[in-house]
Amino acid sequence: MPTIKQLIRNTRQPIRNVTKSPALGGCPQRRGTCTRVYTITPKKPNSALRKVARVRLTSGFEITAYIPGIGHNSQEHSVVLVRGGRVKDLPGVRYHIVRGTLDAVGVKDRQQGRSQYGVKKPK
């Protein structure tokens, strides 16, 4: 515990909260262009080929974003919408691509949890 004299000399500094998605610049989503679409392998206990894209955002940042769902049509020069949200087993992947908007089509034949994957209600 500091003494009164120490507190007079230096006031307490407020705790600065660091944003988990700095590339979005306080916005809920940002538009970007895919520069590279590829797969990476997850951290230790898991095993898969996770689909990710390198995206150049309108804010000027170049980020790695996860492509959720089974199958995708994203390729180089695709214009995509990016939201925050990390992928726990992929180090350095702190963003998700929003399916069903711009050039990223929704997941084919999806019946449940459609909202997350940009799929309209089946007739």
UniProtKB/Swiss-Prot annotation:
CC annotations in GO: chloroplast; ribosome; small ribosomal subunit
Source domain of life: Eukaryota
SUPFAM superfamilies: Nucleic acid-binding proteins
CDD domains cross-referenced by the UniProt entry: Ribosomal_S12
Record Pfam families: Ribosom_S12_S23
Compartments where found: Plastid, Chloroplast
GO molecular-function terms, A-Z: rRNA binding; structural constituent of ribosome
Gene Ontology biological-process annotations: translation
Keywords: Chloroplast, Plastid, Ribonucleoprotein, Ribosomal protein, RNA-binding, rRNA-binding
UniProt cross-references to InterPro entries, sorted A to Z: NA-bd_OB-fold, Ribosomal_uS12, Ribosomal_uS12_bac
NCBIfam families, alphabetized: rpsL_bact (TIGR00981)
Assembly description: Part of the 30S ribosomal subunit.
Family to which this protein belongs: Belongs to the universal ribosomal protein uS12 family.
Primary role: With S4 and S5 plays an important role in translational accuracy. Located at the interface of the 30S and 50S subunits.
Protein name: Small ribosomal subunit protein uS12cz
UniProt organism field: Populus trichocarpa (Western balsam poplar)
